[in-house]
Amino acid sequence: MNYLPAPPPGTTPLRVLSIAGSDSGGGAGIQADMRTMTVLGVHACTAVTAVTIQNTLGVEGFHEIPAEIVASQIKAVVTDIGIQSAKTGMLASSSIIAAVAETWLRLELTTPLVVDPVCASMHGDPLLTGEAMDSLRDRLFPLATVVTPNLDEVRLLVGIDVVDTESQRAAAMALHALGPQWALVKGGHLRSSDRSCDLLYGGSSAGVAFHEFDAPRVQTGNDHGGGDTLAAAVSCALAHGYTVPDAVGFGKRWVTECLRDAYPLGRGHGPVSPLFQRT
């Protein structure tokens, strides 16, 4: 696949901010974001929202970082280092979501923002309360350049069970109505097909309202961190000035390669791997 341009040695690279939780198993969250961002040649900045206790078998618990500390991390990065894009992952609580939204507005940020609405872990462990879900929809989605839920998160966010193309389109439109510029409904959890089709919707003002991104399904049980990896790659492409459809297309190709190179780890789901050779 074609990669993003690498910065010349000794020059300052583009900067992308990940606002997410830390995964003690190293498969998802901040750790997955930093791996993809680093391999793609951008400087990864972070604002940690939670410290999780997890491994390949699941999430055993987490410690929420105080909202004011999350906000201060974002401010510290933006006011000194500067960013060309950002992404969110696990935000843990309504107070953290509010702090992220308020800080974004206070700093008058206009850089692209990818919102990966992490509501539950891949093992089904809940990561957001109902109140936090409301904050996510009401406060953060309207600031997002693109939101990137999987099918389980779509069900929690807009109450639609995606079972086919028609319901996937309905879900994308319902998500878009919550305020983001674009809504991406990932089809990776729709196991009834040997294809993985993601659907991007940008509304009537986007010209071509729907964009489909289709790829052969990669058969692997080592898929931990796939959603984080996709969103991180999209953020990197947006930092380079890609349009949202082009950035999502790049992210889809990237995560497909990462799934193909995923490796076993522990006794559960191993991580996707961005460490394949760049040829």
UniProtKB/Swiss-Prot annotation:
It comes from Mycobacterium leprae (strain TN). Its EC number is 2.7.1.49, 2.7.4.7. SUPFAM superfamilies: Ribokinase-like. Keywords: ATP-binding, Kinase, Nucleotide-binding, Thiamine biosynthesis, Transferase. It catalyses: 4-amino-5-hydroxymethyl-2-methylpyrimidine + ATP = 4-amino-2-methyl-5-(phosphooxymethyl)pyrimidine + ADP + H(+); 4-amino-2-methyl-5-(phosphooxymethyl)pyrimidine + ATP = 4-amino-2-methyl-5-(diphosphooxymethyl)pyrimidine + ADP. It holds the Pfam family Phos_pyr_kin. Pathway: Cofactor biosynthesis; thiamine diphosphate biosynthesis; 4-amino-2-methyl-5-diphosphomethylpyrimidine from 5-amino-1-(5-phospho-D-ribosyl)imidazole: step 2/3; Cofactor biosynthesis; thiamine diphosphate biosynthesis; 4-amino-2-methyl-5-diphosphomethylpyrimidine from 5-amino-1-(5-phospho-D-ribosyl)imidazole: step 3/3. GO terms for molecular function: ATP binding; hydroxymethylpyrimidine kinase activity; phosphomethylpyrimidine kinase activity. GO terms for biological process: thiamine biosynthetic process; thiamine diphosphate biosynthetic process. Belongs to the ThiD family. Signal peptide: none annotated. 4-amino-5-hydroxymethyl-2-methylpyrimidine binds at Q54. Catalyzes the phosphorylation of hydroxymethylpyrimidine phosphate (HMP-P) to HMP-PP, and of HMP to HMP-P. One of its GO terms (cellular component) is cytosol. This is Hydroxymethylpyrimidine/phosphomethylpyrimidine kinase. Coiled coil: none annotated.
